[in-house]
Amino acid sequence: MHATRSRFPRGAVLAAVAVFSILSGAAHAADTLSVVTFGGAYETAAKKAWFEPFTAKTGVNFSLESYDGGLAKLNAMEQAKNPTWDLIDLETNDAITACDEGLLQKFDRKLLGNTSDFLPGSISDCAVSAMVWSTVYAYDTTKLTTPPTTINDFFDLKKFPGKRGMRKSPKVAMEWALIADGVAPKDVYKVLGTPAGVDRAFKKLDTIKSSIVWWDAGAQAPQLLADGAVVMTQAYNGRIDDAMHKDNKPFKIVWDAQVYDYEWWGIPAGAKHAADATKFIVAASTPQAYADLSKYIAYAPPRKDAIPLIDKKRLADLPTAPANFKRPLQINATFWADNADAINKRFQVWLTQ
């Protein structure tokens, strides 16, 4: 994964100059950047890997707010012409939609220097990928005598009775339902793009609907498992890994049919401190900065040059580790950007039925 190159490649030198020059404007920096993230263990890791080092170098502090995704508040800010956020943490489909609708300012990728080692699609016109994360499911090893190993087991209430935790969203739930119903991962969006495919996914979800405990915030998933409220739960891999390694919880991740995606940094259109937010994105997008995040949470870097900087033992915990990446599905952000409204409406009706 790591291409051979000279010790001081021209691109790296230019990138270093870009980072130095953009950070050297610290004397004119804003006192505080207002940042919204998905909170929890990821935000804690971001503080250690990115926010605190940036503050130490520039004097810029961070005011942090948590949210559960979506563009409602960003839309409201744009309509009021009063953006209160300087930097926003986005899922891919929201990053695409926000850019298309003018809710994010454009990002000059030249500021990143040589970008040849970035993974495909990890830089857009308006945003830069912060990391690669995955939705998986996990279980408590002390509660299940027979370990589940596939996504089919998540839907098998007879073999594995008990409650299931799931994010209150059709995204991933629909994909998992189809895979558990026999659709190959490579064909999921082809099937889901048809009315019959949507019907099929909801029909499969019907088989476990009465046993689902819904969650909204990512931190709730490991807590549901720890409290014994569910026997297995859909979760973000980093949240479960955090509970396993930092809280010594007896959890285990099932990587089969993991749905992975990029997370993004974007700057709201009209942000009051856009220049300093840009400096932060540049600083947080170096190979070392990406590697530093992986020390604190099991999310993978979107740059190949970060891989050699990560401890080999830690690499095994990441979504992209070969042992974990046998039957993955990359979220089709364009599909969700185009179809989220219609499927969400049906999902909300389905929840009440």
Tell where the protein language model's regions lie, with residue ranges.
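A ligand-binding cleft/hinge motif common to bilobed small-molecule-binding domains
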Residues: 95-97, 232-250
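Sec/Tat signal peptide C-region and signal peptidase I cleavage site
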Residues: 23-29
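Periplasmic-binding protein-like
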Residues: 117, 133-135, 198-207, 245-271, ...
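Early extracytoplasmic/lumenal segment of secretory-pathway proteins
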Residues: 30-98
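Extracytoplasmic ligand-binding site segments that recognize negatively charged/polar headgroups
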Residues: 40-45, 83-85, 90-226
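Mature extracytoplasmic/periplasmic domains
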Residues: 263, 268-328
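Bacterial N-terminal signal peptides that target proteins for export
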Residues: 2-14
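Conserved C-terminal helix/tail region of periplasmic/extracytoplasmic solute-binding proteins
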Residues: 325-353
